């Protein structure tokens, strides 16, 4: 069934000067979401969205490209200063942060919000390579 040709909703420019960059760096991918102070998403990107597939998604370069993309989208909405919240053990943590600085944002604070279990579930078996 074909979609009806309706009005395409244009993205309105939000005039937000400061935001929060949530960098989620897992072992398999790196996701960057830039939100306002209340947590409403302004822009987002990930290594997979940028065309990296498989093991290339977990590289620092993929995280850098994704952070650059999310940063440029947020800059269009007027964001100039960022607080950065980094979560996860992935390799894209530092490179994503450097890419956000390269876009031209003023980074006011960097917080590590990686969840640490108080001895939660049993970890998966040890890898043997």
From Swiss-Prot:
GO terms for molecular function: rRNA binding; structural constituent of ribosome. It comes from the Bacteria. InterPro entries: Ribosomal_uS11 (IPR001971), Ribosomal_uS11_bac-type (IPR019981), Ribosomal_uS11_CS (IPR018102), Ribosomal_uS11_sf (IPR036967). The keyword rRNA-binding applies. GO terms for biological process: translation. Keywords: Ribonucleoprotein, Ribosomal protein, RNA-binding, rRNA-binding. One of its GO terms (cellular component) is ribonucleoprotein complex. Located on the platform of the 30S subunit, it bridges several disparate RNA helices of the 16S rRNA. Forms part of the Shine-Dalgarno cleft in the 70S ribosome. Part of the 30S ribosomal subunit. Interacts with proteins S7 and S18. Binds to IF-3. Belongs to the universal ribosomal protein uS11 family. This is Small ribosomal subunit protein uS11. It comes from Erythrobacter litoralis (strain HTCC2594). The lineage of its organism: Bacteria, Pseudomonadati, Pseudomonadota, Alphaproteobacteria, Sphingomonadales. The gene is rpsK.
């Amino acid at each position: 069934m074909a979609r009806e040709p309706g009005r395409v909703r244009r993205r309105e420019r939000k005039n937000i000067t400061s935001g929060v960059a949530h960098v989620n760096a897992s072992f398999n991918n790196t996701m960057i979401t830039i939100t306002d102070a209340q947590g409403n998403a302004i822009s987002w990107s990930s290594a997979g969205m940028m065309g990296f597939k498989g093991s290339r998604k977990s590289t620092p370069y993929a995280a850098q490209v994704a952070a650059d993309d999310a940063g440029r989208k947020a800059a269009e909405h007027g964001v100039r200063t960022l607080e950065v919240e980094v979560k996860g053990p992935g390799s894209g943590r530092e490179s994503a942060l450097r890419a956000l600085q390269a876009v031209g944002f003023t980074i006011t604070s960097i917080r590590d919000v990686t969840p640490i279990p108080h001895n939660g579930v049993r970890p998966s078996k040890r890898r043997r390579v």
